[in-house]
Swiss-Prot record:
Quaternary assembly: Interacts with CAMK2A and CAMK2B in the presence of Ca(2+)/calmodulin or after autophosphorylation.
Highest taxon above the source species: Eukaryota
Region of interest called Inhibitory domain, as start-end residue ranges on this chain: 43-69
Protein's recorded name: Calcium/calmodulin-dependent protein kinase II inhibitor 2
Tissue: Highly Expressed in keyhole limpet hemocyanin-stimulated dendritic cell (DC) and weakly expressed in unstimulated mature and immature DC. Highly expressed in kidney and liver. Moderately expressed in heart, skeletal muscle, and placenta. Weakly expressed in the small intestine.
Cellular component GO terms held in the UniProt record: cytosol; nucleus; synapse
GO MF term (any one): calcium-dependent protein kinase inhibitor activity
Region (Disordered): 1-21
Classification of source organism: Eukaryota, Metazoa, Chordata, Craniata, Vertebrata
Family listed: Belongs to the CAMK2N family.
InterPro entries: Camk2n
Pfam hit, one: CaM-KIIN
Function: Potent and specific cellular inhibitor of CaM-kinase II (CAMK2). Traps Ca(2+)/calmodulin on CAMK2.
Protein's cellular compartments: Nucleus; Cytoplasm, Cytosol; Synapse
Length: 79
């Protein structure tokens, strides 16, 4: 197994025409790329019973009962 050595300033490379000029420091870290490459593959498609079903919605309107009762009593006009 390979040995991991501590990172030091001596190991950093210098860039530009003048190596003694301004320093450009950077660090490179490995990140978990599984989620990047997986994309939508990790998300499963919905089951047949779940298609078209909305999540529970809470309606906070005091007039909703009157509106719902009024819709059942009146036939649609102009249709």
């Amino acid at each position: 197994m390979s040995e991991i050595l501590p990172y030091s300033e001596d190991k950093m490379g210098r860039f530009g025409a003048d190596p003694e000029g301004s320093d450009l420091s950077f660090s490179c870290r490995l990140q978990d790329t599984n989620s990047f490459f997986a994309g939508n593959q990790a998300k499963r498609p919905p089951k047949l019973g779940q298609i078209g079903r909305a999540k529970r919605v809470v309606i906070e309107d005091d007039r909703i009962d009157d509106v719902l009762k009024g819709m059942g009593e009146k036939p649609p006009s102009g249709v």
